[in-house]
Amino acid sequence: LSRADAGTFLRYEHGGEQVIGVMAKDSTNNYYCIESGERVEYQLGESVKLRDDDTARRLGWLMDHYRDGTAAEHAAIAVLAHDLLDLKPDTWKSRRVSVMRDNPTLRRKVEQMWEEAGSNAPANATVTRTYAEGTRTGRVTVSVTNAQGKTIAGIKYAATLNGPAVFANGSATVTGISGAEPIVYSWKATGEGEVKASVAYDRKQVDVF
């Protein structure tokens, strides 16, 4: 790992000058601290996937969406990471006061970005299957929703038929990007037997080192 670039963090005073934002980087990723008061080590240990819940999906979405963001945006992500994951919450609590004192507009930025992530981070994908008995054909409808149950666009997915059937492309799998409305695919049976459908979608995850 290498040091964070200028313009990816904000400064504040807390027993000396400190920074809040990106703490380290590699060729593709930014890294944020979740252990207040500890010195940054520019080495990666073993990684663990953060639990797959709404918090992880929102943070993952923010880290990906604002990969090339402003100093304030990176600082807001860092604040959220500390708020939700810090291993020393009492230490972070006092530091947070200093962060907000020296960066008074950051509080609203944190709130806005968390709300934005809630609207855009995928929480669920649904697929429904219909079948016309006489023609041995059917349709699969795919949609991706956020934590509020609203359909969201721009999420990569793959829908798969489980059974003797293919989509119009001749394959049992179709891939696409979700839209603001559900997307419908036609399929036809290729033999006898039940046909079911499943869907997998792209959701960003957070690695903890």
Task: List PLM regions with ranges.
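Short, surface-exposed polybasic-aromatic patches that bind anionic ligands, especially phosphate groups
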Residues: 1-118
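Enriched for extracellular/lumenal, surface-exposed ectodomains of secreted and cell-surface proteins
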Residues: 191, 197-209
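Short beta-strand element of the conserved SAM-dependent methyltransferase core
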Residues: 142-144, 161, 183-189
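Short S/T/G/P-enriched beta-strand
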Residues: 108-137
